[in-house]
Amino acid sequence: MNTSLEQSGCYSNRETLLRCSDARRELELAIGGVLRAEQQIKDNLREVKAQIHSCISRHLECLRSREVWLNEQVDLIYQLKEETLQQQAQQLYWLMGQFNCLIHQLEYTQNKDLANQVSVCLERLGSLALKPEDSTVLLFEADTSALRQTITTFGSLKTIQIPEHLMAHASSSSIGPFLEKRGYIQVPEQKSASSGTAVSLSEWLLVSKPAIGLQAPYVPSTNPQDWLIPKQTSENSQTSARACSFFSDAWGNLKGLENWLLNSHQQEIAGKPSSSKCNSHCSTSSFSPEAEKAEDVELLDQDELDLSDWLVTPQEPCELEKPVDGSWETSEKFKLLFQVFREPYNVSDWLVKPDSCTNCQGNQPRGVEIENLGNLKCLNDHLEAKKSVSVPGATISDGWLAQNHQDTWKVEEVCKANEPCTSFAECVCDDNCEKEAMYKWLLKKGGKDKNGMPMEPKSEPEKHRESLTLWLCPSRNELTEQAKAPKAMAPARIADSFHVIKNSSLSEWLMGPTCKGGPKDVPNTEERAGKEMLQSSMATSWCPFNTADWVLPGKKVGSLSQFPSGEDKWLLRKKAQEAFLNSPLQEERNFRPDCYGLPAVCDLFACMQLKVDKEKWLYRTPLQM
């Protein structure tokens, strides 16, 4: 008994717990629905306010347009009345002039022939209207009470109860169109063009309406076909074709989208049903409801195809499909149609052209305010800048040179205007300051003054060349000093030098092998003694044979032994080694790399102690005797 009681108690507790859980779940769902409804009301509130503002603004604009139209009508009526009264006044003035002439003739003359003229004028006077032919009263009548009533009753707010299963899935922006398609909302007919939403409030309220029988509550359909978009019909296809007719007339028959795909994809899609419309994929600007329905049908037709059919794979090169049915004219037509979108253009053509100054030649003079001088630009500078930008053959190096260009002078130092210009392109002077500064700089570089006359001081390029030469070869300094000295050398001295060379024996020109390739067992003392003896012999017999006398004549240099020979000897050995290693003689006999060539020739030139430029000594033309 106790176990049965315990089981019944547990069962009752479990049932109570389930009921409480269900109740809590229902409350949570209800709270969620209330919160969603509150959010939807907020969204709908903003949308309704925007619609009210737009509608009122448009009708206010209509009232303003009506006001303008009425004013124009008043002006037109005034012009018509004025013309009528002017014509009547002209006739009266003319007739009054006739009577003035007759009165003057009757007073001063006794002519009886005027009776006919008087009778004619009196007849004309009887036929004319002496009162204004047109009325002078112009009134404005308006039914202000009706307008006020229309304004006060303009617009209304309506609400509708939406089913719960639609509230959970429909958003605030899509509730209206969705319910309209399903038949929940009856679209009210527009009463007039000025009041599109002016319908009574009773149509939106849930009140009992007189009917034959009670309307059955709404029951959702269980047939899936009722929830799908209906298939395209012939009527819809004709409607969409009419909507795209103007596009076809302008662009030609572009055919379906499948004609624009690759050949491989078209072969894959060949076995599948394609779109039955020719112009279904054309983008039109039609805002009619028929076009919207056609777009819905297009979406359905596109969904029937597989997604892989629309993807482009990199298996084949992307080439446009050949014209259908081999029609070459159709492809040419497409090229001509889309050629407009491929034409090149220059961005500078769209920019505002700056004004040119009136001082440039070939420009028509025109008035310029002094306040706008800062906005003017010289025509020549503008054309040069435009040419440099629009030249098609400009290379990357030209751009690099333009970026790294450094002006030789500053604008502030050269500009002659009262207020210095920011750049030479904005110069407002008669003569461009940049050109004048360039002219002076070129004259200065050429060693001339501002009048074009040569200047005595050394020009800057010569000074720069001299400093560069001194930095590259310090040994040339002595040669330069010799050149600066007074040039005095007797012809007899040159003749004596040639006489000594002619009478000398050939054995004096040869020397023993003392280079690296020679025997290494010679003591250092003997080598040093041989060099001293050679130098002493050169000091006695070879003194007239001075290399400086052959290159740049100058004063006689003292003993040749005072100059170091390490630099010249090393250079000569290095040149001889490079020349010998590059010659085919080294490959044939396979000499060692440390062999510098003929030892006697190397030591001969090394002992001569050449203290001048070797290139000048080799290439200088001989002296004319």
Curated annotation (Swiss-Prot):
Task: Please describe the post-translational modifications of this protein.
Answer: NCOA4 levels may be regulated via HERC2-mediated ubiquitination leading to proteosomal degradation; HERC2 association is dependent on NCOA4 iron occupancy.
Where, if anywhere, are coiled coils annotated?
none
Q: By its UniProt entry, which InterPro entries does this protein fall under? A: NCoA-4 (IPR039947), NCOA4_N (IPR022174)
Q: Cellular component GO terms, alphabetically?
A: autolysosome; autophagosome; chromosome; cytoplasmic vesicle; mitochondrion; nucleoplasm
* Any Pfam family: ARA70
Q: What happens when the gene is disrupted?
A: Exhibits profound accumulation of iron in splenic macrophages, which are critical for the reutilization of iron from engulfed red blood cells. Hypersensitive to iron overload. When fed an iron-enriched diet (2 g/kg), mice die prematurely and show signs of liver damage. Ferritin accumulation in the liver, spleen and duodenum, increased levels of transferrin saturation, serum ferritin, and liver hepcidin, and decreased levels of duodenal ferroportin. Defective iron mobilization from ferritin storage, inducing anemia. Impaired ferritinophagy in embryonic fibroblasts.
**Subunit structure and binding partners:** Interacts with the ferritin complex, an oligomeric structure composed of varying combinations of ferritin heavy chains and ferritin light chains. Interacts (via C-terminus) with ferritin heavy chain FTH1 (via 'Arg-23'); thereby targeting the iron-binding ferritin complex to autolysosomes following starvation or iron depletion. Interacts with ferritin light chain FTL. Interacts (via C-terminus) with ATG8-like proteins GABARAP and GABARAPL1; thereby mediating localization to autophagosomes and ferritinophagy. Interacts with MAP1LC3C/LC3C and GABARAPL2.
Job description of the protein: Cargo receptor for the autophagic turnover of the iron-binding ferritin complex, playing a central role in iron homeostasis. Acts as an adapter for delivery of ferritin to lysosomes and autophagic degradation of ferritin, a process named ferritinophagy. Targets the iron-binding ferritin complex to autolysosomes following starvation or iron depletion. Ensures efficient erythropoiesis, possibly by regulating hemin-induced erythroid differentiation.
Protein name as catalogued: Nuclear receptor coactivator 4
In its UniProt entry, the species of origin is given as Mus musculus
Gene that this sequence comes from: Ncoa4
